[in-house]
Amino acid sequence: MIDVSRGRFVPKSATAYVILPGKIVLFAIGKFPRIPTPIMKRIIVGTAGHIDHGKTSLVKALTGVDADRLKEEKERGITIDIGFADLTVGDVHFGFVDVPGHERFVKNMLAGAHGIDLVTLVVAADESVMPQTREHFDICRLLKVKSGLVVITKADLVDEELLQLVEAEVADFVAGSFLEGAPVLRVSSRTGVGVDELKKTLSRLAARARERDENAVARLPIDRSFTIKGFGTVVTGTLIAGRIRAGDELEILPPVSSSGPAPGRRARARGLQVHGKSTQEALAGERVAINLQGIDLAEVERGQTLAPAGRLRTSSMLDARLRLLGSAPRGLRARSRVRLHIGAAEVLARVVPLGRMELAPGDSCFAQLRLETPTLALPGDHFIVRAYSPVVTIGGGVVIDALPSKHRLREAAQAASWLEKLEAADEVERVALLVEMAGERGMDQDEIAARSGSSNEVIKRAAEAVTKARRAVTASPPPKTALTPLVARPAFEELAGRVRSTLKEFHRKSPLESGMGREEIREKIFAHLPPDIFRAVIANLVERNEIVAEKDLLRLSSHRVALSAEEQAAKDRLAALFAEAGLQPMPLEDAIAQSGVDTARAQRFAQMLINSGELVRVAGLVFHRSAIDGLRETLRKFKAEHGPKLDVTAFKDLTGVSRKYAIPLLEYLDLQRVTRRSGDVREILL
């Protein structure tokens, strides 16, 4: 291994290398060795606490790794940026995220605090609870960290009486929080007292920690990026969901300097390392270093997220449940500018509380966060809000809808009601609500994944549940795909009703017409919708016997064309005129004049014959169906006797028609796939 944090030369004899924070492991290009390790539970542990309370020393005492990697950190003896270490205890692999304690570096602390499973709240025995202890602990509560413990460090520096006093202060400090009743351990990183007990306690807590979803859409918030000459760009972060494999095509979202939602920059995962070991696959809950192929370092920065290409979308607005800390210096007025920390990103935003003009300290409400630059978020993601100036932590919350529309003032009550439903929804109900929100456009599986982050398996189960409950309709016949829209039943039925009413009005105005053109209905009602939805609505109405589909025509099942004896005779006369003409068609105007009825009715009869297929339009000509069918049979016999090839001259000789009719007929036959043109020759396909 070679230390890259100090910029040492990489030997040219190396064939290739995979990089992890601070190190390089050499191996052959194109080969990603699988490290055979037993299945372990993966837990991310974050430190929290005031500056100089011994967080980094504690991590080193546990793991043997000095998480301070910067020269300035070592010179000044304080942590400035996040650091990492790992430890295996039994069947649990711990990844430690060591965060800075100084108030100036809280934004760095926030970049590392996302995705932790357990928090180790560090309190120095010689100082007890201090300002950054409080702010870090507020952040952990706002991020909804569920479990952890308290470590009283520097226990060797004070007497028993003071230790007991600090323990009492700590107990009072965490009362009513997730750390109430949690283990409180005395540790000396210098002497090693309490370190073994700390490892055992972490193992017990890990056993109760919730497993992450390895099948959800993968997301890796980038907290560090760097490059190695001759090798490329490397990013690191905690994989908070899903899995990433060597060779995967990934997308970095949002793109650098993006002013609005836009596709990300794509790259391929050339190599992976998890906790210092080369691997083919990284799973949720692991610290990962990824060498990216096809992207420059200038296109990567802290705060972006790595995800599977094309699966997720960034947004400039987030709907959320926002809570203001009771310790916030003042209320948060509508459109206040704040610093939003989500994942590893810091984004400036305006807060718009829904249904109120101000959020008071200690209160919560639904709010829309309008971002000045886009970010990637999903429902369930927790965030921190810090005041724009002075920069202090004032609150936080959870994302409910990551791709909302902009809410106007008059829509606030409706938006809040919608968010209340989403907030309480389980995975099935969320799919149902998202599809309901999509209205008549519906929502396909990929769109649902982009709005929820759920795995395809979860979405498929949820979609089956809502269709079985008749809350939605799958807008496609089998086989269904990820792009098959799911339409809420009320919206689907509304479209079906519009088809029925459109046909009813058509039949009222044109009682002698057999039906309305399928394409005309599509353009009138479905032009702005995916084609699958049009096909599904029509198929559903036909299945319910409410409409009849006859070739390219649609009609209500109840519609019948009733002609008088005189009208039927005129219609039959028109058909007979074209049948007698064969492949030497008479002009339509001449046939109408000979029909025996007025021009308007004769034109309707001709259109009825065309709609029913008895007459066939070929360019500007009209032929009887029997003539076209006879032509097909003539071509079939010609092919059997003379082979499949014929030119225009042979076609004219075969049919007895002039070039005036031969060319349109041949072009029609090409469209019907009866013939296929190749230069001046046709091939008979029958």
Description of each model-found segment:
Residues 4, 10, 18, 25-28:
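Short hydrophobic alpha-helical segments enriched in small aliphatic residues
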Residues 39-78, 83-96:
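Conserved G1/Walker A P-loop phosphate-binding module
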Residues 52, 58, 77, 98, ...:
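Residue-level signature of catalytic and energy-coupling elements of molecular machines
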Residues 102-103, 126-130, 154-159, 189-193, ...:
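Conserved nucleotide-binding/hydrolysis micro-motifs of P-loop NTPases
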Residues 103-104, 114-135, 145-164:
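Conserved Switch II/interswitch segment of TRAFAC-class P-loop GTPases
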Residues 155, 161, 172-328:
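Conserved catalytic-core segments of large NTP-driven translation/proteostasis enzymes
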Residues 158-162, 172, 275, 295-617, ...:
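C-terminal effector modules of nucleic-acid-centric enzymes and ribosome-associated factors
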